[in-house]
Amino acid sequence: MQKPELRRFEKLGEMMVQVYERYLPTAFDESMTLLEKMNKIIEYLNQIGRLTNDVVEEWNKVMEWILNDGLEDYVKETLEKWYEEGKFADLVIQVIDELKQFGVSVKTYGAVGDGKTDDIEAFEKAIASGYPVYIPNGKFAVSRSIKIPSNTVITGAGIDNAVVTFLDSVPLGDSLMINDNYATGNENIYLSDFTLDGNCQRFGVNAIGSGGSRDSNLSIHASKNVHINRIKSINATLHGIDITCGGLDYPYMGDGTTAPYPSRDIYISDCEAPSLGDDGITTNNSEYITISNCNCHDPRLLNNCNGIEIDDGSRHVQLSNNISKNCFGGVEVKAHGNVPAAYNVSINGHMSIGDVRSYNFRHIGHHSATDPESMSAKNIICNNLMSVNPNNKRGFQNNAAPRVLAVSAYYGVVVNGLSAYTTEPANLTETAISVQFRARNVSLSGIVMTGFSMAENAIYVIGGSRGGDSVNISNVTLNNSGRNGVAIGSGIDNVSISNVSAIGDGIANPIAIVKTVNSNPQISGVNGIGYPTVCQVAGVAYNDGLTLFNGAFRGATSSSEFIHSEGFVLGSTSKSGATASKSGVVSSSNSIAKAERSLIAGSASCTTSGSYNTILSSLNCETTDTGNLISTSSASKATGNRNIILASYGVLASGSYKVNGGYGGEGTPSASNIKLGNSLNGHIKAKNTVTGANTWSDYGEYFESVDGQAIETGYLVTLEGSKIRKAQEGEKIIGAISETAGIILGESTWNWQGQYLKNEFGGLIYETVEIDEGVFEKMPKINPSYNPKLEYLSRGERPEWNIVGLIGQIMVRIDDTVKIGSGISAKDGIATDGDTGIVMQITTPYESSKGYGVAKVLLK
C-alpha cells in the first residue's frame, strides 16, 4: 500500500491533544489501546464539525496503512517510550498551549448550558483568557451583560444550537451583549454562529427598552472593525442588533452636527432578528456599515418597529439582499428632528413581505412648510427592491396607511427597479408610492406594480406648501394598480414623467394613467388600456396621449447658440439660437430669435430683436421693436410696430401698421426701395402703374336709387337730387349701371359711413391715439352716435345701392337708332341716337323681342 500524505495532519495533533485533555485525565489511564483512542478522537472531531469528510477519509487511510504494514507495535512502543521518558507530558502541554490559539470553550471554564445555571463567570473567564471563545451546544443563561473587549472572537456551534439568554432575574437596563468600553469604543470584534435570546418575556408582553440603546440583544458602541455573522437575535426588549456611537444614550445635538465616537467599519451578514421590541437591526450615528443577507421579522409591538432602521446620523451604509416581514417599516432610513438624518445609504436588493411601509425614508421635524429644511437628509440609492402584500392588519402606529414607498424631506433619492405585488388589494386603498413632505430631487425608474386595484394612486407626488418637487418618474409598468397611475399635486414645478404603461381593465372607476394639477410637467411615452383618459393635465383630458416638454428644446439640430428655458431650435444648423422666452427657430441656419414671442422659420442669417416678431422663408433679414413680420424676402429690415414686408429685397419698413413690398439697392435695407405700401388707415401707395387684371375699363361709384330698388345693368341713369333713376329723353346722362367697373368707390365695405366724424367738406376728423405703448398715430375720431353692436351690411349687399359706371368704356342698352361712331341720348334709360359719348362697338344687335341691344360706349 502506498504511504498516504501525512503533512496535512500536522495541525490535527494539536486538536487531538485538546480532546485528550477532555477525555484522558492522565495519559494511558484508560483500557483502550492507543489506536482506539486516536480513532475516538477522530470520531469526536467529526461530530463537532471540526473535520471535513475528505480529512476523515485520509485519516482512515493512515489507519489502514499503519495496521496493514505492521507498524502498530512500533507506534505503541514509541509513544510508550516517550511517556516513560516524560516527553509525552511535555508534548501534551505544548500542544494544549498551541491549541488554545484556535479557541477555548466556555464549558472549559465551568459553563453548564442548561438554561438555568448562571454561566456569566464562565463567559467572563473565557473572554478574559484572550483566546477565541467557543460556545458549544446548549442554552447558556447569564445574570448580567456579556461585555466584549477589543480583539475578541466569539463563535458558537450554530444558530439555535448555541443559545445565550438572560436569567429571569435580570432587571431592565442591560443589553445581553455589549462591548465593554461603550463610551469610547473597542476594535477588532468577531461574533458568529449563535443565538441571543433577550428573554423579554420576563417583563411581560408589552416590554420595551428603558431608554437609549439599553435592553438590546447586541449593542455595539463607538467600535471599529466589528464582524457579526450568522447571529440570531430573538425576544429583544429593544433592538436585535444595535450599532451606535459612544454612550448608552443616543445624542441629540441638532441637525448638521456629528456625534463623537461613531462606530465604523461594521460588517453584519446572515443574521436573523424575529420577535422585535423595536427594530431588528438598527444603526445610529455610525459609518461605513454593510448589512447583507439578513432577515428581520415579526415584531412583538405595534410601534415604529422596523426590520432594518438606518437611523440618526448614520452614513455610508450599504444594505444588500436582506428580508423583512410583518414589520411597520421594512427598511426605514430616517432621523428625529434634532439630529442629522441618515445619509449616503445604498440598498441593493431587499424583499419586504407584509410590512406596513416597505421602504420609508424621512427626516422627522422637517416635513411642514414652516419647519427648517433638513441639512443632512441626502443621498439614498436603491436597486432591485421588492414589496409583497404591504398591509397594516395589525394596526401599527395607530393604523397608519400602508405604502410601498414613502419619501419625505430627503434630497437625492434614486430608486432603480422596484417590484410591488399584492394579492390583497383591499389592504391598500390610498397611495402606494408617495413622494411628499418637501422631498426633492427624487428619481423613480423601473417601477412594476401589480394588483393594487383599490389604491387611489399608484404613484403620487403630493403637492401643496409642503409637497415634493424635482421628481423624475420613468419606465413604469402598472398592472391594475391605481385609479390614477401617476398623480402630481399642485404647486409642483419640476416633474418629468416618461414611459408609463398601464393596464386598468381590472380597476373600479379608473381615472387617468397620468393626472397632474399643474400644466407644466414633462410628459412623454404614456400609453395603456382600460383607463378613460391617458393624460389629464390641469383639468384637460387627453384621451389619446400627450407629449409635453419643458425647458430649452433642441431637436434634429447639429449645433446651436444659447437656448432659453422656454425656447426651442428644431431642424437647424450653424449655431442657430433662441435666446428669449417663448422664442424659436425652425428649419433655419445661422439665425437667432432674440426676443420674446419671436419665431424664425425656413430662413438663413436672420435675427429677431423685438417681441412678437416673425421671419419666414427669408435671407439676411432682421426685425426689431414689436409685432413685425418679414416673409419670403432678403436683405430687409422691419422696425417700428406691426409692420409687414412681403416678397421684397433691400426694404426698410418703419412706422407702424404698414404692409410693404419692394426691391432695390445692393443689400442695405432702405425705405427708398419700397414700391408698394398700405397703411393702418387704409392708404395704399404704389410707386408704379396700378393695372387691372381683366379687360374691365370703366370707373364706377355707388349711388342709391330713388325708389329703393335695384336698377338692371346697362340702363342709363340721371340724378334726382343725390339719388338716381333711369334717364329720360332730354335729361343729362351721368352714366350707366355697370358690371365692368375696374375701380369702384363708395361701397362702405366694412363700416357704417357715419362711424367716424367728418368735417363740412366730408373729410375725416382725426385725433392722436397711443396705439401701442409709446407709439402714437393719427386715427379717425369715432362718432358718438356709432353703435358697433348693430348689424351692418355693405352697400354691395343692399339692393338700393347701384354701381354706376361714370367714365370709361361702359356696356349700355341701345335701341335700333344707335350707330357706331355716333353719340347717344336716353329714352326710358335706353340709349338712342344722340350727342353724348361715342359708340365704340355694338356687341349685341337690337332685338325687338327683347326691346334692346348692347353697345360699348365711351363716356367722359
From Swiss-Prot:
Entries under SUPFAM superfamilies matching the protein: Pectin lyase-like
Main location: virion
Residues that bind ATP: 752-801
Residue ranges that the Swiss-Prot or TrEMBL entry lists as coiled coil: none
BP-aspect Gene Ontology terms: adhesion receptor-mediated virion attachment to host cell; symbiont entry into host cell via disruption of host cell envelope
Binding site for Mg(2+): E309, D311
Cofactor note: Binds 1 zinc ion per subunit.
Entry cofactors: Mg(2+)
Annotated site, Cleavage, chain positions: S697, D698
Keyword field: ATP-binding, Degradation of host cell envelope components during virus entry, Host-virus interaction, Late protein, Magnesium, Metal-binding, Nucleotide-binding, Repeat, Viral attachment to host adhesion receptor, Viral attachment to host cell, Viral tail fiber protein, Viral tail protein, Virion, Virus entry into host cell
Cellular localization per UniProt: Virion
Post-translational modification: Autocleaved to produce the 74 kDa gp12* assembly attached to the phage particles. Autocleavage of the C-terminus is a posttrimerization event that is followed by an ATP-dependent release.
GO molecular function ontology, one term from the record: metal ion binding
Domain of life where this protein originates: Viruses
A cellular component annotation (GO) from this entry: virus tail, fiber
Domain notes: The N-terminus has three domains that function to attach the appendages to the phage, digest the cell wall teichoic acids, and bind irreversibly to the host. The C-terminus is an autochaperone that aids trimerization.
Assembly and binders: Homotrimer. Each appendage is a homotrimer of gp12*.
General function of this protein: Structural component of the 12 appendages that hang from the lower collar. Adhesion protein that binds to the host cell surface during virus attachment and mediates teichoic acids degradation.
Designated name of the protein: Pre-neck appendage protein
